[in-house]
Amino acid sequence: MKRLFMAITLFFGSCLFGFAQDAKTILDKCAASVSAKNGIQADFTMNSAQYGNSSGKISVKGRMFTATTPMATLWFDGKTLWTYMSNNDEVNVTTPSESQLQVMNPYNFINMYKKGFRYSMTQSGNAYQVHLTATDASKRVKEMFITVDKKTYHPTEVKLLQKQKWTTFTIKNVKAAKLSDAAFRFNSKDFPSAEVIDLR
């Protein structure tokens, strides 16, 4: 009886480990699909109980991104974030945290998932859905659901939980691009009348 119990425990343990490995493999392939050397561009929609709703375009190259919505334009060069608010012609300069970046850049999960999360995965139709649960209580992002296209391995939806509120990004029209590093930095020449406020 004891041997049977141990065998069952080992079986289910190995199954759960296998599912976690499969989920990690899917996320690794997903991260690789959006880590093109010269960058990618996409359209996105954000629905958030905490931050409101918006839509726009995003360009990503490694850790760098720029996002444009009707209200704001953001540039992040991997260290510094510039946020231009069109309603008051003002640019705020900050050094954001990873959790802050996550609600600005739906692709930022590729910089987060490898440490501090437990994985599980389901499949539905032409997509994988990977569920990530934080194993570190100090993480501001407690849960994430990443929906990944089975054919392209591009993420089509990123859903994350912060402060007990969900934010959902829907991503479409992904395409490769040739983007220079300069495209991810604010250029004052393009906004000559903007007031720059350094909050670092």
Regions from the language model: what does each represent?
Residues Q41-D43, W82, H131, T147, ...:
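Soluble periplasmic/extracytoplasmic beta-strand elements of cell-envelope proteins
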Residues F5, L16-G52, R63-M64, D89, ...:
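N-terminal leader/targeting segments and the immediate start of mature chains
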Residues S33, G56-S59, T73-L74, R118-Q123:
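Short, exposed beta-strand/loop patches in secreted or surface proteins that constitute
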Residues N38-D43, K61-A67, N126-H131, T152-E157:
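Short, hydrophobic/aromatic-rich segments at coil-to-beta transitions
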Residues P96-N126:
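Flexible, surface-exposed loop/linker segments and immediately adjacent secondary-structure boundaries
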